[in-house]
């Protein structure tokens, strides 16, 4: 980790309902490239005395000209709460969620079966296999 990088938090809020701390993160990195999210996670984990696996950072935008990047961070009380409340795509970035991938042919067949029925019957056709 580079010493010339400063991580500041603002608009800090403790969200007791979702068991997390949420904040806006400002990263100051004058004369340097944008700091990787893993490094920001590690610095925030050290600031809040926790492990990097419960820190979720996202939405970073570097200001024109560089030197300052702003984004959001959420620090969960435990990994269970994070898995329960975080969107699946953010969990996948951390390697905590694996999306089951159906084959292209299966997806196309399902789509074409769905086109043949209308209304609420689509749910039953989409969920079940083709009945011949």
UniProtKB/Swiss-Prot annotation:
InterPro entries: eRP_eS24_sf, Ribosomal_eS24, Ribosomal_eS24_CS, Ribosomal_uL23/eL15/eS24_sf. It is found in: Cytoplasm. It holds the Pfam family Ribosomal_S24e. The keyword Ribosomal protein applies. PROSITE patterns: RIBOSOMAL_S24E. Transmembrane segments: none annotated. One of its GO terms (cellular component) is ribosomal subunit. Keywords: Cytoplasm, Ribonucleoprotein, Ribosomal protein. Belongs to the eukaryotic ribosomal protein eS24 family. Component of the small ribosomal subunit. Component of the small ribosomal subunit. The ribosome is a large ribonucleoprotein complex responsible for the synthesis of proteins in the cell. Required for processing of pre-rRNA and maturation of 40S ribosomal subunits. This is Small ribosomal subunit protein eS24. The gene is rps24.
């Amino acid at each position: 980790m580079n010493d010339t990088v400063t991580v500041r938090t603002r608009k800090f809020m403790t969200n007791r309902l979702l068991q997390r701390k949420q904040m806006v993160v400002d990263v100051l990195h004058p004369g340097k490239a944008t700091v990787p999210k893993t490094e920001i996670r590690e610095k925030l984990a050290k600031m809040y005395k926790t492990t990097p696996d419960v820190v979720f950072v996202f939405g970073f935008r570097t200001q024109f000209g560089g030197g300052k990047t702003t984004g959001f961070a959420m620090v969960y009380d435990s990994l269970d709460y994070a898995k329960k409340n975080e969107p699946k795509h953010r969990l996948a970035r951390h390697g905590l969620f694996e999306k089951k991938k159906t084959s292209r042919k299966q997806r196309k067949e399902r789509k074409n079966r769905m086109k043949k029925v209308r209304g609420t019957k689509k749910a039953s056709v989409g969920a079940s296999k083709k009945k011949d």
